[in-house]
């Protein structure tokens, strides 16, 4: 069939209209995605391929080509580091974008650097962040906004099933994108808590104290501010305060005065029964897991609900090991990706986030050695998800860590 010039103009205009429509849909998806209780993917049922064809996204892809994205992220886990090396190879071959993992011991190092840069061109293009660090960066206007509206695969986020719209009580509002989800759990032999009065698969402060009494010197938790240790303290405080609602808003002086003594009184009972009589603590959950593997500890802690199966499959822990959670629910939060407002390679950073939210990348993260749960609807495994407990407001994190250090850190 021969096309006239009028026909060619028609198809050209049609293509532009399709691109405009895709851009409008992408924006609509992201707006709906941040409304409570609305799943934009289900409402609009828009194929990702249509969002990817928008002129907005095509321009981002063009700008990203040849960029090197400096990704500041925790480097203390071999499975995570291996996963990021795999992702870097995939991103380079698919998008001609180079991903460089800048390993940090704690993301607060990157936050301090952004603060020192004071809004000038940043050496950081992408951050792995959540909690009080996100709260600070958002408050100081140091983050690029509208990420959900400019990254097509954000439409896959399982916002109806997972608590992905707030980060430690702080609304995300497009300033970061969920990458994975963590749920605090305890790994122990299935018989350990069977005679403590706890309901099946759950623990309580009193049942942990009973186990410590029966197994002196073989119970502990990572030293705060290591986040597993801090979260253990938060789980205790939620239980001891009977889920006092003041924990989920800013930590006022009165709330601290009323609630924190509950935690300190409990720890004063637990520590004399703990490893090193509470005079020393594992430096990380990795060290605690190692001591559990060596049978020096009777329990360990994790933020990955899939970790136990990985450990059992590789015969690093006994086959009788069991996953437990606090009776009030497992503290659940997302770990997220954010782009500094002053990033020099923001287009490339958006492409990296887009890939890391893809089914391919999320499946590799879930099924590979990391085993990190997915945050996208197509891969959500509700059967393996623990009953969730809301995270405490971000302000409680610093309060608990500082007060703990004053009382027990010397």
Language-model-detected regions and their locations in the chain:
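Periplasmic-binding protein-like
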Residues: 266-273, 281, 305, 316-338
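Hydrophobic residues within well-ordered alpha-helices
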Residues: 114, 137, 288-293, 339
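Extracytoplasmic ligand-binding site segments that recognize negatively charged/polar headgroups
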Residues: 74-86, 105-109, 127-278, 282
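Extracellular/periplasmic juxtamembrane helices and adjacent flexible linkers that interface
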Residues: 344, 355-410
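Early extracytoplasmic/lumenal segment of secretory-pathway proteins
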Residues: 42, 47-136
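Alpha-to-beta junction loops
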Residues: 117-126, 142-143, 215-218, 294-299
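A ligand-binding cleft/hinge motif common to bilobed small-molecule-binding domains
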Residues: 134-136, 299-318
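A bilobed periplasmic-binding-protein/Venus flytrap-type ligand-binding module shared by bacterial periplasmic
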Residues: 187-192, 238-241, 333-348, 364-365
């Amino acid at each position: 069939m021969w096309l006239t010039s009028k026909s060619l103009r028609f198809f050209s205009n049609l293509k532009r209209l399709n691109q405009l429509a895709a851009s409008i849909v992408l924006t609509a998806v992201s707006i709906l995605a941040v409304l409570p209780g609305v799943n934009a993917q289900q409402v609009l049922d828009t194929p990702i391929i249509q969002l990817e064809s928008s002129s907005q996204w095509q321009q981002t892809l063009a700008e990203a080509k040849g960029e090197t994205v400096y990704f500041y992220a925790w480097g203390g886990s071999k499975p995570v580091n291996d996963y990021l090396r795999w992702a870097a190879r995939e991103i380079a071959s698919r998008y001609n974008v180079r991903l460089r993992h800048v390993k940090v011991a704690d993301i607060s190092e990157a936050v301090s650097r952004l603060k020192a840069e004071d809004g000038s061109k940043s050496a950081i293009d992408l951050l792995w962040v959540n909690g009080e660090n996100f709260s600070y960066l958002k408050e100081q206007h140091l983050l690029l906004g509208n990420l959900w509206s400019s990254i097509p695969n954000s439409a896959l986020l399982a916002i109806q099933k997972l608590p992905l719209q707030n980060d430690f009580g702080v609304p995300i509002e497009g300033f970061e994108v969920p990458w994975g989800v963590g749920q605090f759990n305890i790994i122990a032999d299935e018989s350990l808590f069977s005679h403590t009065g706890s309901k099946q698969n759950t623990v309580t402060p009193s049942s942990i104290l009973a186990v410590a009494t029966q197994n002196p010197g073989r119970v502990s938790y990572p030293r705060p501010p290591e986040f597993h240790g801090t979260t253990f303290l938060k789980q205790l405080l939620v239980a001891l305060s009977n889920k006092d609602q003041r924990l989920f808003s800013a930590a006022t002086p009165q709330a601290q005065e009323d609630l924190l003594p509950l935690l300190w009184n409990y720890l004063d009972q637990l520590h004399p029964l703990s490893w090193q009589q509470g005079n020393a603590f594992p430096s990380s959950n990795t060290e605690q897991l190692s001591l559990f593997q060596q049978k020096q500890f009777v329990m360990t802690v994790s933020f990955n609900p899939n970790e136990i199966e990985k450990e059992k499959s590789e015969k690093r822990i006994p086959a009788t090991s069991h996953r437990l959670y606090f009776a009030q629910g497992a503290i659940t939060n997302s770990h997220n990706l954010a782009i500094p407002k002053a990033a020099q390679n923001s287009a490339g950073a958006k492409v990296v986030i887009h890939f890391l939210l893809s089914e391919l990348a999320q499946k590799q993260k879930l099924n590979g050695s990391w085993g990190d749960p997915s945050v996208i609807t197509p891969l959500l495994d509700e059967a393996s998800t623990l009953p969730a407990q809301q995270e405490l407001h971000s302000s409680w994190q610093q309060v608990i860590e500082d007060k703990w250090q004053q009382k027990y850190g010397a």
